[in-house]
């Protein structure tokens, strides 16, 4: 990868999004930390970054719908995915003990994922935009009666000391991130191994049996669907588009045949990306 290639992610250093970035591009990758998911999209479209990472799915909390909406218009292309484990610790400034804590900061999902542990105390639980940012805020404000729920790496980066580890209620929890680029970009990534996956956006007319017809065509082609998600179409009241992950590459003959037939029964049909599936760390 060229040394001038920059990858955008949402959050502070140590965020799970940065973990996903490092897992995909390597620890030496040049990074651009931005404040929100929408800022990642903006950085790709204005050229400040050539690639970006956004979370799309968590095993416990499900689909990240904001990400779906940000790639809805086709301005971004999915070129890869990265899957990272969600390991959580409780950390505070050096010298702070469990009995000193009155409040705990973290992203709402991280608080929910560690709730059984957190509810063993009478701490006030306060939601922040991201996990690593919670740790940075405690450090910057020198809060000696507060702790953060975040990853072990984020705790270390922000000068915090672990008070409890493995506090997530599901030790197998993982988050899947999309690796994205602008569809107008010529930026390339190195070849990756992994089973193929293609993500489609499908719109159907508001008529009986239209979604069923789509599913039957995909099944008849022998292509497995691993994910199906609906979102408002933004084009009419109570009308929806569907996001589909298919276990086939865009050049797969079976999928190409299905796409030709799908065009006849859909109001909108677009490939948002075809890429190798990411392996869990």
Question: What residues fall within each predicted segment?
Answer:
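Domain-level signature for soluble enzymes in the chorismate/prephenate branch of the shikimate pathway
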Residues: 1-281
């Amino acid at each position: 990868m060229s040394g001038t290639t920059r990858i955008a992610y949402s959050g502070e250093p140590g965020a799970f999004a940065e973990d996903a970035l490092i897992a995909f591009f390597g620890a030496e990758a040049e990074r651009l930390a931005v404040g929100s998911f929408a800022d990642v999209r903006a950085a790709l479209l204005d050229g400040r970054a050539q690639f970006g990472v956004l979370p799309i799915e968590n095993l416990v909390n499900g689909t990240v719908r904001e990400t779906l909406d940000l790639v809805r218009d086709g301005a971004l292309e999915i070129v890869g995915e990265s899957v990272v484990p969600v390991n959580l610790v409780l950390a505070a400034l050096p010298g702070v003990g469990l009995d000193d804590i009155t409040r705990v900061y973290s992203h709402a999902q991280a608080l929910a994922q560690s709730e059984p542990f957190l509810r063993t105390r009478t701490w006030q639980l306060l939601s922040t935009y991201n996990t690593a940012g919670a740790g940075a805020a405690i450090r910057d404000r020198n809060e000696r009666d507060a702790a953060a729920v975040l990853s072990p790496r984020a705790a270390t980066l922000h000068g915090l000391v672990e008070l409890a580890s493995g506090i997530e209620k599901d030790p197998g929890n993982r988050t899947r991130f999309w690796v994205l680029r602008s569809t107008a970009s010529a930026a390339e990534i190195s070849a990756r191994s992994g089973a193929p996956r293609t993500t489609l956006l499908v719109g159907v007319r508001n008529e009986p049996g239209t979604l069923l017809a789509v599913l039957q065509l995909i099944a008849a082609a022998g292509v497995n669907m691993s994910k199906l998600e609906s979102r408002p179409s933004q084009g009419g009241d109570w009308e929806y588009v569907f996001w589909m992950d298919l276990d086939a590459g865009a050049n797969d003959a079976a999928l190409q045949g299905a796409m030709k037939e799908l065009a006849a029964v859909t109001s909108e049909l677009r490939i948002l990306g075809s890429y190798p599936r990411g392996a869990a760390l």
